[in-house]
Amino acid sequence: MNVFFMFSLLFLAALGSCADDRNPLEECFRETDYEEFLEIARXXXXTSNPKHVVRVGAGMSGLSAAYVLAGAGHQVTVLEASERPGGRXXXXXXXXEGWYANLGPMRXXXXXXXXXXXXXKFGLNLNEFSQENDNAWYFIKXXXXXXXXXXDPGLLKYPVKPSEAGKSAGQLYEESLGKXXXXXXXXXXXXXXXXXXXXXXXXXXXXXXXXXXXXXXXXXXXXXXXXXXXXXXXXXXXXXXXXXXXXXFDEIVDGMDKLPTSMYQAIXXXXXXXXXXXXXXXXXXKVTVTYQTPAKXXXXXXXXXXXXXXXXXXXXXXXXXXXXXXXXXXXXXXXXXXXXXXIFLTCTKKFWEDDGIHGGKSTTDLPSRXXXXXXXXXXXXXXVIIAYGIGDDANFFQALDFKDCADIVFNDLSLIHQLPKEEIPSFCYPSMIQKXXXXXXXXXXITTFFTPYQFQHFSEAXXXXXXXIYFAGEYTAQAHGWIDSTIK
């Protein structure tokens, strides 16, 4: 399973009992009110008691809430600090050359029903997202092997136990999580989640599932799960359950930002861009939100309720007057966020097709880590390759300038595809680099992830409301890094 492409749509959920189901883990994470949210997404109900609501942040979470509230007849004001709506779901397009690239989320899980309903409502076309390709390459420990052949970690010079030989790193990773899951099936889901939240994914794989240490290293390098090694096993199990159930992913044709843009156009009159919220003060039953406009004047909007739907780090920057509960403040400060760097090359010649690669990704332990060949069929001859790093892998590129980053990617590609290094720049040029950490409004994070113990300590506190001020950013969802749970 690709822990790496953590950006796409997916649905997950709350903790009911899960003793007797086909996939007990999936039941554990299914939120009891998911169907209710889906109904709201399909057809908005009208309200008999309209109120004025201020939304802070026009990312996926803010836009979808504002869209539903406005549809129900409430008066909505959306404040967005940057110049454009959509937050981390963004795309860069060069209309002249006929290519586009998703800078944020790249895929939507077919099982992500809330996102699919919204896409259907706006008439957006979906295209299958190719995640794997048997002809793609692994270039690890200075040896190149085709993905189809790299079934066996022994081929990549990892010493493994006899019982582990002949299995791919992804299989070993899923089996070890599966053992942990089987142990959980006997207990109730709440107990299972608490137990799983206590250990790191790497510790669980080595201790509970008795995988050899070298097998854990192989999974880290080949399944690119290294970045998530410190994440709590609960988060890893949740992602595995959701993604394994539906292996099919889609992408929105012409860019993932079509979804937020369509929502924004429907409520454009109520949204103010380049307005950064500074303080939210609750007095009696009203909330006053103070914000900076481009004219540098501080303006205030009074409303019946305010929902701050910003990224976790940005939530800490806005001051709430009836101070948020201490537990909520601690949770917002302590949730760890992962950074990402994505480096895009635009190519006039699809040199990877010579190796039979159409979409999917190659994996390496060189700095580029995962090089994905975008399957988005561009009309012109140009195509896009993305080198994608998350967490510590992304930090490697943060301090380097555009040219140095591109040189490293060219060098890594020449090794992976076994081409002369000077040949690739002759038909590819670096078109774009997206360092999520450097973006001002996102405040340095692309996705939240819980480290051990945080799930049981923080998941409720993070979503607690303070008087009439509500928090609904991505970090309050049960699954982090997926548009579907963010919309909810």
UniProtKB/Swiss-Prot annotation:
Protein residues bound to FAD = 60-61, 80-81, 88, 104-107, 474, 481-486
- What GO MF annotations does this protein's record show? L-amino-acid oxidase activity
**Does the keyword Cell membrane belong to this entry?**
no
Q: Write out the annotated subcellular location.
A: Secreted
GO terms under biological process? amino acid catabolic process; apoptotic process; defense response to bacterium; killing of cells of another organism
Tissue specificity here reads: Expressed by the venom gland.
For activity, the cofactor(s) needed are: FAD
Cysteine pairs forming cystine bridges in this chain are: C347-C428
What modifications follow translation?
A: N-glycosylated.
EC number in record: 1.4.3.2
InterPro entries per the UniProt record, alphabetical: Amino_oxidase, FAD/NAD-bd_sf, Flavin_monoamine_oxidase
Keyword Signal assigned: no
- What does it catalyze? an L-alpha-amino acid + O2 + H2O = a 2-oxocarboxylate + H2O2 + NH4(+); L-leucine + O2 + H2O = 4-methyl-2-oxopentanoate + H2O2 + NH4(+)
The family database entries (Pfam families) matched by this protein are listed as: Amino_oxidase (PF01593)
Q: Where does substrate bind?
A: R107, Y388, G481, W482
Q: Which residues are the signal sequence here?
A: none
Describe its partners and assembly state.
Answer: Monomer. This is in contrast with most of its orthologs, that are non-covalently linked homodimers.
- What function does the entry list? Catalyzes an oxidative deamination of predominantly hydrophobic and aromatic L-amino acids, thus producing hydrogen peroxide that may contribute to the diverse toxic effects of this enzyme. Shows activity on L-Leu. Exhibits diverse biological activities, such as hemorrhage, hemolysis, edema, antibacterial and antiparasitic activities, as well as regulation of platelet aggregation.
Q: Which family does it belong to?
A: Belongs to the flavin monoamine oxidase family. FIG1 subfamily.
Q: What is this protein called?
A: L-amino oxidase
- Upper lineage ranks? Eukaryota, Metazoa, Chordata, Craniata, Vertebrata
